[in-house]
Amino acid sequence: MRLPREIGPIHFVGIGGIGMSGIAEVLCNLGYTVQGSDASEGANVVRLREKGVKVTVGHKAGNVNGADVLVVSTAIKRDNPELMAARAQRIPVVRRAEMLAELMRLKSCVAIAGTHGKTTTTSMVATLLDAGDFDPTVINGGIINAYGTNARLGAGEWMVVEADESDGTFLKLPTDVAIVTNVDAEHLDHFKTFDAVQDAFRSFVENVPFYGFAVMCIDHPVVQAMVGRIEDRRIITYGQNPQADVRLVDLAPNGGGSHFKVMFRNRKTDAAHEISDLVLPMPGPHNALNATAAIAVAHELGITDATIRKALAAFGGVKRRFTRTGEWNGVTVIDDYGHHPVEIAAVLKAARESTDGRVIAVVQPHRYTRLQALFEEFCTCFNDADTVVVADVYPAGETPIVGIDRDHFVLGLRAHGHREVVPLPESAALAGIIADLAKQGDYVVCLGAGNITQWAYALPGELKALG
């Protein structure tokens, strides 16, 4: 039995969230009656309303009246008035991943997992399958610039989804093709130990059916070790590693992007194949690796080399992934979601490759617990930044932790040898600081998962206002 077409209103609590909004949009496009609520207005709420979805701002018990099912994410607390009202009325309550799994049951599915790179890789897989006339349905964790949304309903038999591992619910997703980009010690608030994180990713791959396959990056030592422990499943490895089945080679910066080729090696026959002259309009080795994963899937599904090459060269990127928000006197301002040390280091390396000028990082640490758990890593991931401007920690609902704040982070960066670290007293002071620091050819890279994205978009105009 599948999700009945005649089911009444499906109510999403927190419908404006990036994960929830994509599922709601696809359900709406399929003809289901969708409604929801969110704590505030936002771009996703506006977009859903334009599609005819009723969205209420604020969580109130009366919002669920008449709903046949309630969809919640793990961010919704047990004392949420809508959740409590639904349970009092015996309305079925499902987690976000469970509803996503219902949609995935309708299609053959590619699911992209990993601590970093999921959203970009999901977008790349979707782009290549779209170019190959697969017309996929897509549910992503970020806004795909080519679509102007994080979700689309396709008429084809394939679905491409971002598999969020943060709460372990990605194990519920019925996956035919799994991608694992990397595995780091993240989301320990849920998993408790890194061993548990690794076990979850291993289960994710082992859940792939015998007729499916997994694409795994063996440049990452944890993933390479995991490959050696997985039995009875078809694995395609990728990376710059000479042992990879799909190998990224001859990578070179190319005018703000990358130029490379990909080599395929069949382990059974030792036959080789090459796709040369690949151009990706995004900088950084990490993005070239993400593209290699997408190419591996596209090649396996029969998409031609020429189609892959053309689609990759036209890839429009993802919002908040090395997004240029504007320029001022030859200074480029970049907005990026990077909030983990591995991501920050990769983004700054990409910035360093993209300019002959200086790289100025503006970082808004996200969550006290993350800064505390990875303090050493945070203090050593800014090596490619000439200057680091440090804002207050974005709490994301957390209680402050003594000794884990902006000023201690500034001291930590300096103690680890960084030459120029500037504390940001308030967001209103950012334009003045950048105006004093930046020169023509410099990149200003705003990093974080909080509201720093708003600063990044406002900064070019604020700089122009200063003269």
From Swiss-Prot:
Organism: Nitrobacter winogradskyi (strain ATCC 25391 / DSM 10237 / CIP 104748 / NCIMB 11846 / Nb-255)
Protein name: UDP-N-acetylmuramate--L-alanine ligase
Subcellular location, record wording: Cytoplasm
Nucleotide-binding recorded as keyword: yes
Superkingdom of origin: Bacteria
Reactions this protein catalyses: UDP-N-acetyl-alpha-D-muramate + L-alanine + ATP = UDP-N-acetyl-alpha-D-muramoyl-L-alanine + ADP + phosphate + H(+)
Record Gene3D superfamilies: Mur ligase, C-terminal domain, Mur-like, catalytic domain, NAD(P)-binding Rossmann-like Domain
Keywords assigned: ATP-binding, Cell cycle, Cell division, Cell shape, Cell wall biogenesis/degradation, Cytoplasm, Ligase, Nucleotide-binding, Peptidoglycan synthesis
Similarity-based family: Belongs to the MurCDEF family.
GO terms classed as biological process: cell division; cell wall organization; peptidoglycan biosynthetic process; regulation of cell shape
Pathway involvement of the protein, from the record: Cell wall biogenesis; peptidoglycan biosynthesis
Enzyme Commission identifier(s): 6.3.2.8
Function: Cell wall formation.
Binding site for ATP: 114-120
